[in-house]
Each structure stands twice: as structure tokens, then as C-alpha cells.
Amino acid sequence: MTGDGRGVLYPAAMPPLHRLPAPERVSSLVRWFWIPEWNIVPGRVSRQELLAFPACHLAVEPTLVGLAGPTTRRSHRDLTGRGWTVGALLRPAAVPHLTTDPYALRDRYQSLALPDLHRAVTTAMTG
């Protein structure tokens, strides 16, 4: 799937997004993977307005691996420069593997120490 704007308030302003089904071996833990890539003109910002979504996401970014908790309100992410993210929409069964206190993740984004995952994804995304 490509260009699926579900969860984004203004999909026409969204950078290219690839949405891929989870492979069978991880489908009990991941609903799908999402990969946006952007290249914003210097000095410009692309604000991505997001709807609340009651699920956790694991996201690998160029500088970190993060775990986003379920959201209870609209939010946004400002994109600048060139970048990418490889994200996974997690099923509830995956969350206890990543945190001991899922409730504390509500409306939060926390960094995770997963250097091997970060290295593998960064290598795949940057060649």
C-alpha cells in the first residue's frame, strides 16, 4: 500500500508514505508497517496533523528508536529537511515486550535502547 493517509488530517500535505502489511511471522504483534520519507525545502516546515489513535507504535528514526503510546487527542509532527521513519503499528500483544508499564505511555513518546534494530533499519534506509 502506498499513499494511505488514514490518521492524517490533511493527507494532501503529507510526504510520500508507504504502508506495508506485516509479514505472517510477526502479524500477531504488528498490524502494519508505515514508512514516510520527506525532503522539505530549507527554511520550510511541513506540519503533519494527526488524529488520536488508541494503539502503540514503534518508530525507528535516523537518531533514535521510539515507542509512542496510545493518544487521546489530536497531535502534530513538524517535518523539516530530509528524513524518514520506519514505524510499526503494534498489536496489544507486542507492548509488554517493550515496556513494563503500558499505561504510562498514554500520550507519550519515549526513546528505547535498541541499537541493533536502529543500526539494521538505518542501514536499510540509507543504503
Q: Model-found features: residue ranges?
A:
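Alpha-helical bundle regulatory/interaction domains
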Residues: 1-127
